[in-house]
Each structure stands twice: as C-alpha cells, then as structure tokens.
C-alpha cells in the first residue's frame, strides 16, 4: 500500500459543472482526434481568472486552495488548452478532485454574484420575482 507524503489533498471548490463536456474541431470525427483531458478544477481556474477577471489571490480563495496550488492548476489548464487549439485536439472536460460550491443569498447581499455565476441562487430568485 502506498502512502501519500505531506499534507492531505483538499477538495477544490467549483461553482458549477459545465454545460458541455467536449470541444473539438469542426468536421473531424471524435474517433480520429487526439484528446486532452481538462479537469473541472482546471476549467474553474480558467473561468475565474480569464473570464470573470479575478486576481489569482481572489480566485484561489474562491476555490478554497493556496495561491501556489491555484497557480499550478491554472498553468496546467492553459498548457492543455493551448495544446488543443494549436494542434487541433479535442478537449474532454471532466474528472478532478472537486466539490460544488454552495452559494447563498446572505453571501451575495444584493451585489452581483462574486463568482460570476449566471445561475446563482440569488440570480434565480431575482428571475422568479420578475
């Protein structure tokens, strides 16, 4: 039996599972493409920094991990996405060591969702009020 050295690995917090789990070049069957696996925490790191525009420190806090671990996840994600785009590979999104973050109305306090979620609990309630 192998034992892991160092501190125990903690679950990474992600906001939501993606709507799609595969991206591929158009016109080429999946079985003819090489693929790159992008974990859900790698996708979340890209979303928080490159899409939402959070700093690395804020994004690491959002995911419940250290900045060093966050940076390693983000670096890995960017390398995989770059490889897929440059070399025409399929991106398969899935797996990882994560937990879905629980967003609550008290945390948002009427402000835009700090996690950049369109389907946040608060936003769902606003839509129902209309």
Curated annotation (Swiss-Prot):
Instruction: Please give the coiled-coil regions recorded for this protein.
Output: none
Q: What is this protein called?
A: UPF0251 protein Mevan_1492
- Recorded source organism is Methanococcus vannielii (strain ATCC 35089 / DSM 1224 / JCM 13029 / OCM 148 / SB)
Concerning its family, UniProt says:
Belongs to the UPF0251 family.
Query: Which lineage ranks, top first, belong to the organism behind this chain?
Result: Archaea, Methanobacteriati, Methanobacteriota, Methanomada group, Methanococci
Q: Known InterPro entries for this protein?
A: UPF0251
């Amino acid at each position: 039996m192998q034992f892991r050295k160092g501190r125990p690995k903690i679950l990474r917090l992600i906001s939501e599972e993606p709507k799609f789990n595969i991206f591929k070049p158009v016109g080429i069957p999946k079985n003819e493409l090489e693929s790159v696996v992008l974990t859900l925490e790698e996708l979340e790191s890209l979303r928080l920094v490159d899409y939402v525009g959070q700093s690395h420190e804020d994004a690491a806090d959002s995911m419940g991990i250290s900045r060093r671990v966050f940076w390693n996840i983000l670096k890995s994600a960017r390398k995989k996405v770059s490889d897929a785009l440059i070399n025409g590979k399929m991106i398969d999104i899935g797996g990882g060591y994560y937990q879905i973050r629980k967003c609550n109305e008290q945390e948002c306090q009427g402000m835009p969702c700090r996690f950049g979620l369109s389907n946040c609990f608060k936003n769902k309630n606003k839509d129902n009020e209309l």
